[in-house]
From Swiss-Prot:
SUPFAM superfamilies found in the cross-reference section: PFL-like glycyl radical enzymes
Assembly mode: Homodimer.
Protein name, per record: UPF0210 protein lmo0534
Spans through the membrane: none
HAMAP family: UPF0210
Native organism: Listeria monocytogenes serovar 1/2a (strain ATCC BAA-679 / EGD-e)
Protein family per UniProt: Belongs to the UPF0210 family.
Pfam families: DUF711
InterPro entries for this protein: UPF0210
Length: 451
């Protein structure tokens, strides 16, 4: 590399908050299935602790060697509904506790995969797991849960959508002492991906290798600084600038993934190209959009600005990396983005605009606080809307919403750390009860028939 490129990378890290957001080790638990739940849990604990024993140490060694901040070291596992489903257990909270204990033992901050895939229907394991999610999240610290309720090929399982509204509500109540923190670790998906390194939606797909390393990069501050240098230029120039910047960011992710793979003796999977914000000043996706010329995110033009950003990040990132995957786009989590928080407080950004933006961006309605008296049916209807956007547009969408008990519009919900602070946003006051009560399945769209 030329000296100026090395200096540029150092500046990106020191001044523009460029970092590797996560190194996530995906671990298959398919060989841990057992008719005896206790035996299965012992196998699960042993496998996770054995495979991930050096994950945190290797991450820290790479940080020291290259001077690249690696914010999180995490683990994803095969959806537990599949693994626990072979046991005779009638409650899976003990499986969640096993995951939690393993995560603490190896020192990772989150473990994902307390999950069920029910886009077309339930198995016994799915039913038990989904029913146990509120207690599992209330009784663990590091476990993340996700449920896939729809896909472009199968349509939307509206029975699962209805149930997830109830699950979110119950989770908020059981974790009311932490302002509904359990809901921040629960994601409802359509078109969930099998190699996502980001929490809370990560799980290790059944089509994946026994063990793999996936990397999630992040650099909103770097992209914003690059756009500052092309003020007033046409969008062609803006797109090209973002592309070139995304290339540099992703190159770093590729390097870290390869080195981690070699040091751990585990195959390198993918780099997720997502721009993931944090609550820190200078690390905001909203501020990138505003740098393109919007007075505040949420105003007219926001969706178009996000479309340009998302597409340019993918085009630049794909050139820099052998295998891309995960969610790959821009995240717009309200509580984790200083610009989003401000826009909500100023009344510039509402749920309806966020929903429009999710037709473009990486995920969906993410880290949004709504009033504590929001009904389970309203939450389910929000999930149905997001799932419909994902299913019709053949993309991943998701809902991570927090109906924090006792809160009303305008209150602030404090999570701390990377999860940030969420202003409580108003929801539509009209009822969706009869709509959600129908149940059944919304059929797959006509363009899903590809064969």
């Amino acid at each position: 590399m030329e000296t100026n490129q090395i200096l540029e990378t150092i500046r990106m890290i020191e001044e523009e908050k460029l970092d590797i957001r996560t190194i996530t080790m995906g671990i298959s638990l398919l060989d841990c299935m057992d008719g005896d739940g206790e035996a299965a849990r012992k196998k699960i604990y042993q496998k996770i602790v054995t495979k991930a024993r050096n994950l945190v140490a290797v991450g820290e060694a790479i940080e020291s060697e290259f001077g690249i901040p690696i914010i999180n070291k995490r683990i994803s596992v095969t959806p537990i509904a599949i693994i626990a489903g072979s046991s005779a257990d009638t409650d899976y909270v003990e499986f969640a506790k096993t995951l939690d204990a393993a995560a603490k033992e190896v020192g990772v901050n989150f473990i994902g995969g307390y999950s069920a895939l029910v886009q077309k229907g339930y198995t016994k394991g799915d039913e038990i797991l989904i029913r146990s999610i509120p207690q599992a999240l209330a009784q663990t610290e590091r476990v993340c849960s996700s449920v896939n309720v729809g896909s472009t090929r199968t349509g939307i399982n509206m029975d699962a959508v209805r149930q997830m509204g109830e699950v979110i509500k119950e989770t908020a109540d059981l974790t009311a002492d932490t302002q509904g923190l359990g809901c921040a670790k629960l994601v409802v998906f359509a078109n969930a991906v099998e190699d996502n390194p980001f929490m809370a939606g990560a799980f290790h797909g059944v089509g994946e290798a026994d063990c793999v390393i996936n990397v999630g990069v992040s650099g909103p501050g770097v992209v914003k600084r690059a756009i500052e240098k092309v003020k007033g230029e046409p969008f062609d120039i803006v797109a090209e600038t973002v592309k070139q910047t995304a290339f540099k960011i992703t190159r770093m992710g590729q390097l870290v993934g390869q080195v981690a793979s070699e040091k751990l003796g585990v195959p390198f999977g993918i780099v997720d190209l997502s721009l993931a914000p944090t609550p820190a000043i200078g690390d905001s996706v909203a501020h990138i959009l505003e740098e393109m010329g919007l007075e505040m995110v949420g105003t007219h033009g926001t969706t178009a600005a996000l479309a340009l950003l998302n597409d340019a990040v993918k085009k630049g990132g794909v050139m820099a990396c052998g295998h891309v995957g995960g969610l790959s786009g821009a995240f717009i989590p309200v509580s984790e983005d200083a610009g989003m928080i401000e826009a909500v407080q100023q009344g510039a950004l509402n749920l309806e605009k966020l929903e429009a933006m999710t037709a473009i961006c990486s995920v969906g309605l993410d880290m949004i606080a709504v009033p504590g008296d929001t009904t389970a049916e309203t939450l389910a209807a929000m999930i149905a809307d997001e799932a419909a956007i994902g299913v019709i547009n053949n993309k991943t969408t998701a809902v991570r919403v927090i109906p924090a008990s006792g809160t009303k519009v305008g209150d602030m919900v404090e999570f701390g750390g990377l999860l940030g602070t969420a202003p409580v946003m108003p929801v539509n006051g009209k009822s969706s009860v009869d709509f959600i009560a129908r149940g059944g399945r919304i059929p797959a769209p006509i363009h899903s028939f590809k064969n």
